[in-house]
Amino acid sequence: MKLNISTDHAPAAIGPYAQAVAVGNLVITSGQLPINPATGAFPEGIAEQTRQSLTNVKAILAEAGIGMDRILKTTVFLSDMNNFGAMNEVYAAFFTEGSYPARSAVEVARLPKDALVEIEVIAAK
């Protein structure tokens, strides 16, 4: 049975989708843009945007009753692969060395609201 996960500590969906769904022991988030849920604004720069996207992921997982250590796989969408290094530095700080999740990072032509980064995850309860 599928259960939608929703929290006010992450931005509301900007379309007809859930922040995340839980099915069985999996939690699958929608892509998280770097929207500050309190202000609706984007921070400046790739480092700050990466931090906000991952903070949003963390809030959604907390609503599901799990932490970042339960992430199995992330997908990082970048509007410019030249931002990979700066994104990677911030990304690493959200995980414990030696227990990083699997990850794909891809450049895309454009992200919603012209974000620099969007991050989605699959986690296990």
Task: Give names to the regions the model predicted.
Residues K2-K125:
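Short, polar/acidic, helix-capping and beta-turn segments at strand->helix junctions
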